Amino acid sequence: VFSGQKGNYNTDDTPDAFDNYGLTKISGEQIRSGIIIRASIIGRNIMKQHGILDWMINGKEKKASGYVDYIFNGITTLELVKSIEKILKKNKNPKNKKIYHIGSSAITKHNLLRIINKVYNLRKDITSKRAGKINRSLSTNNFFSPKKNIEQQLIEYKKFSNIIY
């Protein structure tokens, strides 16, 4: 829901996305009561393998380029499920709209690729490129965000996803 011009967005910030993806997310938030969870997810997709993790794992190239000026704070889908469970236990019948930001510490896409490369032992040469300063990080100072850093999350996710894939 955010353009990425500012970064470290909190739940009170006015959504300012201008692309179709962001605008559809904004329209989905037009509710009076319920829970809205904002997160950038990192995980595998059995049906469509086009996320950053699948791209790295399935890519045949020995090189991968990551943006050094694109910042976000993703969370693995496994950690997201744990956070959602906590939120649902706390909010059994929300009478008002509640917005939660869930994510890890902010990281560049370049550094995320380096961590994925290490955790999955891909042996790829990670190079840097520029996107034109984008910071879509969310302020996640809440009880529901994971205590594990993204590398720890990916290690746990890898063990878990080996059961499925």
Each model region followed by its residue ranges:
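Active-site "gating" loop of Rossmann-like NAD(P)-dependent oxidoreductase/epimerase domains
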Residues: V1-D19
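NAD(P)-dependent short-chain dehydrogenase/reductase
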Residues: F18-D19, E29-F72, L78-E79
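Active-site YXXXK catalytic motif of short-chain dehydrogenase/reductase
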Residues: Y21-K25
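Alpha-helix C-terminal capping segments
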Residues: I26-G34, M56-K60, I102, N117-Y120, ...
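Short, amphipathic alpha-helical "lid/cap" segments that border enzyme active or binding sites
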Residues: H50-I57, T77-E85, K147-N162
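Residue-level signal for the nucleotide or nucleotide-sugar donor/cofactor binding architecture
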Residues: F72-I75, I107, L138, K148
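Mid/C-terminal beta-alpha module of Rossmann-like enzyme folds, strongest
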Residues: V81-N135, Y165
